[in-house]
Amino acid sequence: MARIGDGGDLLKCSFCGKSQKQVKKLIAGPGVYICDECIDLCNEIIEEELSESSELKWEELPKPREIYEFLDGYVVGQEAAKKTLSVAVYNHYKRVQAGGASGGDAGKGEVELAKSNILLLGPTGCGKTLLAQTLARMLNVPFAIADATALTEAGYVGEDVENILLKLIQAADYDVKKAETGIIYIDEVDKIARKSENPSITRDVSGEGVQQALLKILEGTTASVPPQGGRKHPHQEFIQIDTTNVLFIVGGAFAGLDRIIESRIGKKSLGFRAVLHGKDDPDASNVFGDIMPEDLLKYGMIPEFIGRLPIITSVSNLDREALIRILTEPKNALVRQYKRLFELDGVDLDFTTDALEAIADQAILRGTGARGLRAIMEEVLLSVMYDIPSRKDVARAVITREVVLEHVNPTLVPRDVAASKRGPRQEKSA
């Protein structure tokens, strides 16, 4: 036990040697003591190490081609969107590595690199959210998804825009430095378009008001974020986060924007010679390739908001072939997922080609895109997933077109039949 003095009644810190009279607090442990000054020093060392570990580090920043190839493993089709996103993300994080918007040397004549956020257009269920999620997974950065429809101006019922940043901080385990290099995907942004092209004299708290509130965080600012939500806990301490290096990807279906584009480029949208598009017509989404900022202005987005989204790309409607590829090709394809589920019960699951075609046709018919494929698969496989765990005699289940369309029971192959069929094949191959 560390003691000083003739009487041995004064205790001292086991680390720095100061007596209990020289420090504010001395904390006892099993045979040792530590003072408040040493505790503060330890905290400073830990904080420095944590801040260094939370900095964005890559041995080498992935090149646009590498990013594209990674996206290709998870997202089917949408080549133009993947190419645009690959270049935009590479340039963004190259800028972050170079030192941010000012780079620390802007005053010495260095070129200032501005941030370029991304606007992603296209119908629902075509991969907008998946593209953003896959990018964040590859780069190993914090990722948050926000729904623009829940946002309102400060002071009105709904979520404040600062809650978007809170989700990102939570995704980074409250490591603010790490969150400052994350990606935020704001979905359904078309729902915050103002109600008319012309500015209104009445207050639009969930439309134009939200666009105005988003301007600063999109551009880059130091925002004050309430860690528990600002409205329920008004007296809490705020977290300061700099959004200069946060990449914002803003997405929406923008239903009706195709007609605005067509009227500008000269295609008739009214009358006997009008170009008619159904909800699932591929041309209705392909026309987004001709978009101009003035089209978004007519749709109801304010000029300042459009100006902070300089990169515009779009995803197109998925046809039957693309949906079949989504079912089978990606690393986490639905067919592979369900095959794995059945393997855990010792059963092989097979889909015929016409069954996959029928599932794709159902998704097109429902207008849900790739997002609706899982719901259809659950409906098709419900009865067999109910029976299989209780049956030990089944080796294989075969899903045919009739199972999908007519809801008949799938073909179940018993284990003895499967073994007898497997035997001759093995003898032949041997």
Swiss-Prot record:
Entries under InterPro entries matching the protein: AAA+_ATPase (IPR003593), ATP-dep_Clp_protease_ClpX (IPR050052), ATPase_AAA_core (IPR003959), Clp_ATPase_C (IPR019489), Clp_protease_ATP-bd_su_ClpX (IPR004487), ClpX_bact (IPR046425), P-loop_NTPase (IPR027417), Znf_CppX_C4 (IPR010603)
Protein keywords: ATP-binding, Chaperone, Metal-binding, Nucleotide-binding, Zinc
Binding site for Zn(2+): C13, C16, C35, C38
Membrane spanning stretches: none
SUPFAM superfamilies in UniProt: Glucocorticoid receptor-like (DNA-binding domain), P-loop containing nucleoside triphosphate hydrolases
GO MF: ATP binding; ATP hydrolysis activity; ATP-dependent protein folding chaperone; protein dimerization activity; unfolded protein binding; zinc ion binding
Domain of life: Bacteria
Domain ClpX-type ZB span(s) in chain numbering: 1-54
One Gene Ontology cellular component annotation held by this UniProt entry: HslUV protease complex
An example Gene Ontology biological process: proteolysis involved in protein catabolic process
Chain positions recorded as ATP binding sites: P123, T124, G125, C126, G127, K128, T129, L130
UniProt record similarity statement: Belongs to the ClpX chaperone family.
Functional note: ATP-dependent specificity component of the Clp protease. It directs the protease to specific substrates. Can perform chaperone functions in the absence of ClpP.
Subunit structure: Component of the ClpX-ClpP complex. Forms a hexameric ring that, in the presence of ATP, binds to fourteen ClpP subunits assembled into a disk-like structure with a central cavity, resembling the structure of eukaryotic proteasomes.
NCBIfam families: clpX, PRK05342.1
Protein name: ATP-dependent Clp protease ATP-binding subunit ClpX
The organism of origin for this protein: Parafrankia sp. (strain EAN1pec)
